[in-house]
A protein has these predicted regions:
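Core subunits and conserved enzymes of cellular information-processing
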Residues: 1-128
Length: 128
């Protein structure tokens, strides 16, 4: 697999459309950090790491009635074309209704947190 983050976002998108209660994927620290941001922002109900070889990352999805809380996910920086932004260039997603996720030297964080800390980095994805 050439892009594990895109694979993660696609699994979440497909599980949400199929109204599945949870989704599993191979574990990595980057994916776990991204999942914890989704949980903190209220897009995912629960994040857990299942032991074993190989480790699995399990996300419990949130729904409002019969509709997923996550309306859209979009990968920005890809392996073939990286997208870096400075602290002043961090975009707002849907006028603040969504979240941009950025990988900075201090770790993975939302665009709002990176702006407050005056950090730039690789723009991973948008979630709304």
């Amino acid at each position: 697999m050439t892009d594990p983050i895109s694979d993660m976002l696609t699994r979440i998108r497909n599980a949400g459309r199929a109204l599945l209660p949870a989704v599993e994927m191979p574990h990595s620290r980057m994916k776990e950090n991204l999942a914890n941001i989704l949980k903190k922002e209220g897009y995912v109900a629960e994040v857990s790491v299942e032991a074993g070889m190989p480790k699995k990352l399990k996300l419990k999805l949130k729904y409002q009635g019969k509709k997923s809380v996550i309306e859209g996910l979009r990968r920005i920086s890809k392996p073939g074309l990286r997208h870096y932004v400075g602290a002043t260039e961090i975009p707002r997603v849907l006028s603040g209704m969504g979240v941009s996720v950025i990988s900075t030297p201090e770790g993975v964080m939302t665009g709002t947190e990176a702006r407050k800390k005056n950090l730039g980095g690789e723009l991973l994805c948008y979630v709304w």
